[in-house]
Design a protein with these regions (language model features):
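Extracytoplasmic
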Residues: 2-22, 32-102
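Conserved beta3-strand ATP-binding lysine motif
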Residues: 29
Length: 102
């Protein structure tokens, strides 16, 4: 059973990527500089993901989202699978769940 605790609620706007965001998203990285977020998005897309960049204006941070789900449990399982797929990427071990608020 995936751990569904530790969900952060944020108001975000999609700035790159054509995948629509659902309620729960797996965030692989956060950047203050858009170009850095775009670099990770490009790398993830090259790995077969359809990643999205969302901007949190309150925190002035770009969130790189690996995938998005309507269901919290499915999102937590996807986050855990993402972390397990890249055990040597310490930056990915901090992947977290974002709950989109409007």
């Amino acid at each position: 059973m995936a751990d569904t605790s530790g969900v952060r609620q944020e108001k975000v706007t999609v700035v790159s990527g054509n995948e629509g965001l659902k309620d729960y998203s797996v965030v692989a990285g956060s950047f203050g500089v858009k170009a850095n977020a775009e670099g990770l998005k490009d790398w993830l897309d090259g790995q077969g993901y359809h990643s999205t960049i969302a901007f949190n204006a309150d925190k002035a941070m770009y969130r790189v989202i690996v995938n998005s789900f309507a269901d919290k449990t499915a999102a937590a399982e996807a986050r855990d699978a993402f972390k397990a797929k890249y055990p040597n990427r310490s930056d990915f071990q901090g992947a977290w769940l974002l709950y989109r608020v409007y």
